[in-house]
Amino acid sequence: VSTLLYRIGRVAYRRAWLVLVSWVLLLAAALGGGLALGGQTEEAFSIPGTESQEALDQLEQLFPAAAGASAQAVVVAPDGASVTDPGIRAEIDDLAADLSRIDGVRSVLGPFDEFADGQVSDDEGVAIVQVQLEGTSEEVDDTTLEALIATGDDRDARVEFAGQVFQDTTVGLTVSEVIGVLVAAAVLIVTFGSLAAAGMPLVTALIGVGIVMGGILALAAVMPVSSSAPLLALMIGLAVGIDYALFIVSRHRTQLARGMDPAESAAVAVGTAGSAVVFAGLTVIIALLGLLVVGIPFLSVMGVGAAFAVLVAIAGAVTLLPALLGIWGARLVPRAGSRAWRRAQREAEHARTMGRRWVRGVMKRPVLTTIAVVVVLGTLSIPTFSLDLNLPDGGSEPAGSTQREAYDLIAGAFGPGTAGPLLVTADITQTTDILDDLDGIRSELADVDGVASVSRGIPSPGLELAIFRVAPVTAPDDPATKTVVAELRDAAAGIESEFGTPLSITGTTAVGIDISTRLTNALVPFALIVMGLSVLLLMAVFRSVLVPVKAALGFLLTVGTGLGVSVAVFQWGWGAELLHTEAGPILSFMPIILMAVLFGLAMDYEVFLVSGMREEFVRTGDPRSAIEDGFAHGARVVTAAALIMFFVFAAFVPEGSNLIKPIALGLAVGIAVDAFVLRMTLGPAIMTLLGRAAWWLPRSLDRAMPDLDVEGEQLRDHREHVVWASQQGDAVVVADRLQLQATDAVLSLRAQAGDRVALVADAATRRLAGATLAGYLPALGGRAVVAGAVLPSEAGRASRRVSLVDVGGDRLTVSTTAGELVRERLALAPRAARRGRGGPGARSTDRWLERLATLAERHGASSGPISAADLVAALPAHSRALLLAAVGTLDGTPILVLDAPDGALAPGEVDAIDEVVRALAGDGVVRVWGVAPGSADGLDPADELALLLDTALSTTEAFR
């Protein structure tokens, strides 16, 4: 992975303007598309498979007038007056008439109409006008809402409007978010001591979140998207976008201060720090996509949107950022004697830095440190046990808004439960006395404990359903309301048996309770799945069992602390006024979102810190010095990254939406605790106690897991091999003690352009050697350069420069003709290789076979002409070998590896066929012939030296 990222970084650096323009065009396309499609977010929470949602769906089909969007105009009489006073009553009737004339209004029910029920408060100070709208909440346009609100202007009585349609679902930024970005910029400037270096992470992050915002707006045009989704994606995209770029720029600046070439430094920074970024980002994505397992659509969209933001941040860090580094070039090199330059020198010399002093203090008292951290964080987690979950309603709207004012007026005048009534649907298809049965059902519902009032049953036009509005005594977000819903559902069975009318409990409040229950039940499975997958990924990254387990268990303390502080502030009300909020239940999906995001981000710091420790342990084998040195190298940049994330998240708390505030506070606290207390304090303490056991991994697991090379060991080897390859002069192929798989054979050879080389070994070893030179099999050791491609790190390039030819034709089907073989190879050959030979048609095939016959005759390799219709398998061994070897030249590669079948060709025949191959391929092509031991006798002595040491054969054969 590190080598691949190194190449990506190098290409992006060299083609900086192309990469930058591509990203800017992508940003313009995303934002333009999102705005053009006009997507709007919404707060339509739904949860398929629950009783409340199924009842709503049934209501929408059978009683659309009751299932559509609705609003309430709340009229408050002036002080000392009553809504029943003639003047106020006339004004209410006039208001109802004005409302009924608005486009998009289906019906209006005034408080004094014949079928009105409970729309005037007991003290007659407040009245409600019910407004039924056409379509769902998402389908009601702003023009209709503005017209509704305008009807309340210039009246003697105060008029406020309530209803889900008035909830603010716009996505906007406030001054506090801008301040958060400015504080992040200040941290970057202090970290780098350079405006240019500090600006690059901000640029990549802002471009990334712009693309994400455009994508989410476009998505909102075709499917429901919660208003929290873009805010969550924005918050996470900014945080990880800045952090990921920070790690790479920090590595780049350190390398520049130590004298590395800027282009090479950018590529190396992307290959090393970028590897940690990629795998840290993958853990975040895994955690966020884990929200899909919960099975709640709006939550799945939030998870996918946030995961997309992380993916874009990763892509920006490894492509856009090196392009910016390329544009700035050598101007980013710290001046000699500057703070950045001195810091880089101190790190190289293992000087006493703040990070080194801190970790030494932790390592001196690991037991005391562990106990202290667990006790403190455990105490902060205590409020989590009183967690109360619910969905937002009118009471969570901003203070002073018309929907919040109306909600408070209804709750105060009619009772808290009236502000969020339950809907009870009754199937009346089997009843014969509808009105009496509805009265009986109403009476039974009113007798349920906790019910304040029940409206008269209203049958649907087709007499399939009837609905009752049930107002609990308590508010929608009161825990007692959950008990009322449960008791209503328990009572439904008895009512059904008495009246033959199945009942369902639904409505916004019931849906919210069902969602909260589903989310609470999903927390443990979600945590197990996400933690399990991430532990497996970290096991592959760190090659350890205990380190990933330690990281996952520490995460539980992080989540507990984040949730505990959020409960204390938003549920208990501690310091709520400082954050411009009020005490109430916690947003029902906040804990699972917090778990997903915090887990991913917590693993970020684990990867960034522990990968440095792993790198030092691999280099030195000393676990204590690995902890100290690895921590010292990563502490400064992790500190800066954590501070940036903290300030970005904290910026959404004071003036953010009520939906996002508790999430933002939980994330800000969780990030600070995780980075500074868990990863930088508890982590080194536990690693010290574990010692060498921290890096234990069973051999079976080690063999089964892929080598992800986060530490960049393979990249270091690759760079060393590139330097070695540059020292090989004009050699086309050089193999330096390549250890072949599944054998003890070691291959060493050197060939100039036009050389012929013989590999002398048994058939199996020859094939292994050919596949290794062509990059298809990795060598167990050694190094090689094949036509400019370094092995083993550039196996893909090597495979395009080498053609493997089995001149025995053992793998051909019996029915393959010579013409089919040539046409197939011509069709697959690169365009440059086909130049002058025509396309893969019959005429070009015949011409090529004629040329082959001419060359074979000239070099004494002919045993008769070969026609296009001849079956290859039926040709004599010599003719078949000639044809197959010649066909191998059609690939146009600079190296041919040809394997001669044991005993099928005499040395003189190999010489003759080789001359034909050289004539077809060109004098500069290297031909590597694989022959059996003893078959080299009599070969042309002009051949270059080939040396194959094969301990299985216990022989060394060399020839010239």
Predicted regions and their residues:
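Q-loop/switch helix immediately C-terminal to the Walker
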Residues: 808, 813-859, 884
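Conserved catalytic loops of ABC-family nucleotide-binding domains
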Residues: 283, 892, 904-940
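Structured non-transmembrane domains adjacent to transmembrane bundles in polytopic membrane proteins
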Residues: 49-70, 79-163, 386-572
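GG-anchored amphipathic helix commonly corresponding to the ABC/SMC/Rad50 NBD signature/C-loop
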Residues: 865-868, 877-897
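Conserved N-terminal strand/loop that marks the beginning of ABC ATPase nucleotide-binding domains
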Residues: 727-742
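Membrane-embedded transmembrane helical bundles of large multi-pass transporters/channels
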Residues: 1-39, 105, 136-389, 500, ...
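Conserved ABC transporter NBD signature motif
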Residues: 779-791, 798
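Glycine-rich P-loop/Walker A and Walker A-like loops and their local beta1-loop-alpha1 context
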Residues: 743, 753-778
